[in-house]
Amino acid sequence: MSFTIKVKEEIIAASSKDIAELSALIKMSGSVGLTNQGLTLSISTENAKIARHIYQLIENRYRCNPELRHYNKTNLKKNRVYTVFVAENVNDILSDLQLADSFFGFETGIETSIMEDDDAGRSYLRGAFLATGTVRDPEKGRYQLEIFSVYQDHAEDLASLMKKFMLDAKVLQHKNGFVTYLQKAEDIMDFLIVIGAMTSKEIFEEVKIMRETRNDLNRANNAETANIARTISASMKTINNIIKIMDTVGLEILPVELRQIAQLRIANPDYSIQQIADSIEPPLTKSGVNHRLRKINKIADDL
């Protein structure tokens, strides 16, 4: 099950059944038809649980008898489309949800009453996400939450609604419409809180922390590996120079303080500068060890 579906099923289970949620679902996934008996309303989704949720919202609020239909786009089960079909009281439903103008082309944004009410705004965002929202699985890397709108003013109203909740929402033109999106992990987690998906928020946060911890460990390991490589490279250069001195003139020609360092380096090729410094009596500073190693290297270079 995708992370998007998990979020949607969680908010369905915790739905407040506010009419703003139903308004978003119908506005973004619905279409109006006309028969000899009057207007019909169809709301379509590829998720059976969302279809059942819409069915129950309409049935409970308007005391009508919707039909739940389905068909396959192809022979693949995952492409099954579910439609809640309403053939009675459609005018009353559209009027109650203030959607009549939306379906007849006069108003494609979000109702002012929803934009101005925080609770209604939360419910509308919940319905909008149920209708066309997606959120990238946090395990897969780059974070992204999107809600698709056919009309630009609706996408921009969604962004304004999100900004009321301190979310950094942006709008991008997309094929056949517009996308309102969030890209920051913190904004996505806050959005999940706004729409009531607390469990999904906690899962998202846990995955985010684990990914960041893994990345930090990888960076630390890479840095440590690089440091070890540099230490070994520098150590081998000095060891080769010490061997050159031994083979050419012998270590006995070195002053005592340099001979002591040379013998330690030959005996402990994997030691860091700090470890060499700590092994000398009395202990030296790292800069003191480096100074003596430079002298040894210069002597070898001059031979």
UniProtKB/Swiss-Prot annotation:
It comes from the Bacteria. Residues 272-303 bind DNA. The gene is whiA. The keyword Cell division applies. Transmembrane segments: none annotated. It holds the Pfam family HTH_WhiA. InterPro entries: Homing_endonucl, Sporu_reg_WhiA_N_dom, Sporulation_regulator_WhiA, Sporulation_regulator_WhiA_C, WhiA_LAGLIDADG_dom. This is Probable cell division protein WhiA. PANTHER family: CELL DIVISION PROTEIN WHIA-RELATED. Belongs to the WhiA family.
